[in-house]
Amino acid sequence: RAKTADSTTIVGRNFDWENCQAMVIRCLPDNGYASVSTANLDFFGFGDDYKPEGMINRFKAVAGVYVPMDGINEKGLVVADLMAGDNEVTNQTCDTLPDLTTTTAIRLLLNRAADVQEALALLRRYNMHSDIGTAHHLFIADAAGNSVCVEWADNRMYVTETNVLNNHYLCAAKQGITSGEESNRHEAILLRWYNENNGILTAAQMADALSEAQSMPNGTYGGTQWSVVYDLHTCSATYYWQRNFAKSYPFSVR
């Protein structure tokens, strides 16, 4: 998360995974905030040739609304899901709270939260359950420039203010536990960009930072599948697909 020279808040995000298909979804709920989000279609098993065309495939596309990996809403709230530093599964079990998974939490926040504080208040009203049997943490940022990491350890929720988040824990309960050296490399690159520019970056510089911090394919691992720069004032997203930063795909919430 950084600011531009005119104090616009921007957020950059790399999604590193196996080779996959992704879909950008504009959601316009009747009783919630409009948003643009990104779904990994491989989680649904739609197949490599899937396109949201025709009645059946368009109906399938609705599933992507509820499993976003990242997104921005019309209030300038950005939420992104990242793997944390280990495989601890969160399963909170308070009898008085409804249940939520990591990805449906992102949809809830995009629909209902205008800023970081509203997002945190919403998360505290639910039992969290990890998707795909591993540890997750969420990066949440708002148009005012607030940004936090939300993590779960021993079924407790922890909140840490931060401008940069990668694939290792920040909370005191598990601080420094990491998924590997690649996460440390990414953090070093992004912190260097942030510190050398005193936290002031253009959208183009944010894209350059994401390009430098990208992951390359290795065997069955596909590396960086998409990169996105979010503008939290215009509520827009500029995507780059599979490390091709020469071609951008702009989307707006409205």
Language-model regions: role of each:
Residues 2-58, 63-65, 70-71, 80-111, ...:
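C-terminal, well-structured catalytic/ligand-binding subdomain of enzymes
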Residues 104-116, 120-126:
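Acidic, contiguous internal or C-terminal segments within carbohydrate-active enzymes
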Residues 123, 128, 138-141:
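Extracytoplasmic, non-cytosolic globular domains
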